[in-house]
UniProtKB/Swiss-Prot annotation:
It is found in: Golgi apparatus membrane. The chain crosses the membrane at residues 6-26. One of its GO terms (biological process) is fucose metabolic process. This is Protein MANNAN SYNTHESIS-RELATED. It comes from Trigonella foenum-graecum. The gene is MSR. It is an enzyme of class 2 (transferase). The lineage of its organism: Eukaryota, Viridiplantae, Streptophyta, Embryophyta, Tracheophyta. Residues 27-413 are lumenal.
């Protein structure tokens, strides 16, 4: 290498060194912040905080948790099929409907009668609606096929005039049917039954065959919503799930109807415990057991009420059907003369949510709990007045789940 080439190589090396030094100076002046300025901000999380809602903040693997039917096919001693009929109506809202169907199936099966598909009594007007206005009639027929003889309507020659009306307790027993219903049925050939719901009732008095029939009717998918209502309910659930995923938390359904609380809330029970909770009380409870303000909450109240403002203040992502439905769907399902449409949608949403919280303990809570238990959605939280500073959501799980004292556990295992 001659002297000229050496000088050129040295000059190039010097230039490269200058660029490196300049780069380091720029980096130091503009990008190397003091350590305290770039330290990641962290929030101390206690073991208690982690124990509150972490187990329900992610989608549970519901297929893994779902129970399996453990009833055997009904083996009632074959009852001679008679020429008589059992008629009934669905009343008081969807939370009662499947239990009413199950009672009617058990009665018809035991008496050897033909079951006539029911109408639906409008809770507002008392007028009759067709079963197909809310439910999939063909599905009902398919599910009951083989369990009991069913007809859509009474034959023209059969009159319902002077039909005896007999009240039967929900989860009616074989003994009750034999003593109270059978003599009337044999004399008249037709009975209209009306289910009533005792405050305490079990199916322990029934034989295994009647229990199996009851289980299969209640939890075998007998009552499914008609397609249009089902699709709307699914659409709402999908929206709420999407919003909850964006918030990285659970989607909580709260059964809270302002009018219902005013009409049904009886203050405290015999032991001095609250029987119902207002919106602000639900909000405070959820905060204390660890739910963050980004939690997505669905409330069964149809239209927004000022009574819910405090709940939304604590949980801004609180919605009602009115906030979610399109104007067309609102006109059809909310502004109609029948509350049955919206209550059917509420029942579905509360059965499918990540977490269910009842503001009042009653049939809606009991039957939603049953649907959730059999599908493995055990996150049912019951509010409480007294919440300790170290309380967690798991401490307030429904006794239906913790004590396994729901009918569903007699039917599934």
């Amino acid at each position: 290498m001659n002297s000229m080439e050496i000088r050129q190589a040295f000059a190039g090396l010097l230039t490269l060194s200058m660029f490196i030094m300049l780069g380091n100076m720029i980096k130091k002046d503009h990008f190397d912040y003091p350590a305290e300025e770039v330290e990641i901000q962290t929030t101390e999380v206690s073991q208690h905080d982690l124990a509150t809602v972490s187990h329900i903040s992610q989608k549970s693997k519901q297929n893994d948790k779902a129970l399996k039917p453990c009833w055997n096919p009904p083996t009632l001693k074959e009852v001679e099929q008679s020429k008589g009929f059992i008629i009934f109506s669905l009343t008081n809202g969807p939370e009662y409907h499947i239990a009413q169907v199950a009672d009617a199936v058990v009665v018809a099966k035991y008496l050897g009668a033909t079951l006539v598909l029911p109408d639906i009594k409008n809770s507002k007007s008392g007028n009759s609606m067709n079963l197909g206005d809310i439910y999939d009639v063909e599905n009902v027929l398919n599910k009951l096929n083989g369990l009991v003889k069913v007809t859509k309507t009474l034959p023209p020659h059969v009159s319902t005039r002077n039909t005896p009306i007999v009240r039967v307790p929900n989860k009616v027993s074989q003994d009750y049917i034999m003593k109270k219903l059978k003599p009337i049925y044999q004399a008249k050939g037709i009975i209209k039954i009306e289910s009533y719901f005792p405050s305490k009732n079990t199916i322990s008095r029934n034989n295994n065959s009647l229990e199996s029939l009851l289980c299969q009717t209640m939890f075998g998918g007998t009552l499914e919503l008609k397609k249009e209502i089902q699709e709307e309910a699914e659409s709402i659930v999908q929206k709420l799930e999407t919003w909850s995923q964006e918030s990285n938390g659970p989607f909580v359904a709260v059964d809270l109807r302002i009018e219902g609380l005013k009409n049904e809330c009886n203050g405290k029970d015999g032991k001095g415990r609250k029987q119902c909770y207002q919106g602000h009380e639900i909000g405070e409870f959820l905060k204390r057991i660890g739910f963050g303000q980004e939690t997505v909450i669905y409330v069964t109240q149809t239209k927004w009420s000022p009574d819910l403002n405090s709940l939304r203040y604590m949980f801004p992502k609180t919605y009602t059907k009115e906030n979610i439905m399109s104007s067309t769907k609102k006109e059809k399902f909310i502004n109609s003369e029948s509350i049955e449409f919206e209550k059917a949608i509420d029942f579905y949403i509360c059965s499918e949510s990540d977490v269910f919280v009842p503001s009042i303990l009653g049939p809606f809570y009991e039957n939603v709990a049953g649907m959730r238990i059999v599908s493995g959605k055990n996150e049912i939280i019951v509010p409480s007045e007294v919440v300790s500073p170290s309380a967690s959501a798991s401490e307030h799980m429904s006794p239906y789940v913790t004590k396994k004292n729901h009918l569903a556990y007699k039917c599934f295992c």
